[in-house]
Amino acid sequence: MPFAPQIPDGSKTPGDPDLFGLSDGGEAFSKNLLPGDGRVFYRSGLLEQPVADESFKALLSGGFWRNDEVVMFGRRRVLSRKMAWFGDLPYAYAGALKQPVPWDAEVLRLKSRVEQAGGCVFNSCLLNHYADGREGMGWHSDDESSLLPNGPIASVSLGARRVFRFKHRRTLEQVEVWLEHGSLLLMEGETQSHWVHALPKSLRVREPRVNLTFRVMREP
């Protein structure tokens, strides 16, 4: 299930408006942010400011948030960061099993918007709520066996502007991008195999952020 069409003649780049079916007149995707071994595209204006504000407010007040849990050194640890998992199947990562909750109307609305922009159908979504810059995410990759291998991952950012970093597993080369309110980041191809990514903590950030990561789960 390819996320972006192949470009056999090199005549188009991810910035071309028609490559991702961007018929809404919004911002175009960037060119590939990675130097190789994967594909990452960024679009700053997926949602207009009023729409992004409305979505952010609706999600913050959602009743689906739960404290995230991880298993470290055989012990279960409850994190301050809130999360929610939407989909038909449970999702296991960091040693803990996340049970799905019923799809929320606002999440479905954003899912439809992302699918329209990216040309792919997603069947699950992981939400993370970062209260401020004291909460972040360390180096990791989204390569769980329950996910479609080399499948697309689409990340929508709402709220505080945060830096997002990629690091190549072998060369340790790093790439960073600032994720704006209402933006979309697309990861596809072999990105998860060759790169890890992180959301660094920052005491300068005092506002909350909500991140929606749309994924494709394997059918059982």
Model-identified regions with their sequence ranges:
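Non-heme Fe(II) oxygenase metal-center motifs and adjacent flexible, charged/small-residue loops
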Residues: 1-220
